[in-house]
Amino acid sequence: MTAYKRVLLKLSGESLMGAQQYGIDPNRLADYASDIKEACAMGVQIGIVIGGGNIFRGVSGAAKGFDRVKGDQMGMLATVINSLALSSALEGVGVKTKVLTAVRMEPIGEFYNKWHAIELLEQGYVTIFSCGTGNPFFTTDTGSSLRGIEIEADAMLKGTRVDGIYTADPEKDPSATKFDRITYDEIYARGLKVMDLTATAMCMENNLPIVVFDMDTPGNLLKVLRGEKIGTYVSNTSA
């Protein structure tokens, strides 16, 4: 029994580095593929967005002198590399995948549209959405919110390197405590940085819940999908 029928899984590019300082750790990729395969076996339809921060981040590039638009486009290409890597890892363990791109680049990936994406999900494909929104000045978190809303996901699962949302940065403040559940209004009131404001506002306005959890611990994705109390659940209601 699963808590969700269809989810949008957001993975950070940095998490793909594993213990490395750059690029893609094959062991981390294999762990992700194993968990996602088990999730598919549970009957959950899974759409995925991966960041590109392990390869290139547009904002950082702009700070170093790159034109911001070109920097963001480089970041979009980084998400394509990560998407292809995850697609390859999943197909290697017998999971059907499709990479859809927000910018035309056939045959690397198929051009995204909502109806085709939903059709693929219903056919059992893990559908990986790359290039963010396809526009500069938008983060991959915003791309995740957009895709989650478009594919009519039950929730967005934000897989990170931390195990939820805290009152403060737990790495800097040892007294920080974790929320098991929090509303979007409280996130704004407390000034918590879960995602950028655009991404958070989109989820709030379209009533898309978020579960923030530690994806780097094998098995956690399956626990979230079973409805176990891990991570932090974010929604418009407190109960």
Curated annotation (Swiss-Prot):
Xref: InterPro entries: AceGlu_kinase-like_sf, Asp/Glu/Uridylate_kinase, Uridylate_kinase, Uridylate_kinase_bac
One Pfam family named in its UniProt record: AA_kinase
The protein's name in its UniProt record: Uridylate kinase
Biological process (GO), any one: 'de novo' CTP biosynthetic process
Upper taxonomic lineage: Bacteria, Pseudomonadati, Bacteroidota, Bacteroidia, Bacteroidales
EC number: 2.7.4.22
Annotated Gene Ontology cellular component terms: cytoplasm
Pathway in which the depicted protein is active: Pyrimidine metabolism; CTP biosynthesis via de novo pathway; UDP from UMP (UMPK route): step 1/1
Source organism of this protein record: Porphyromonas gingivalis (strain ATCC BAA-308 / W83)
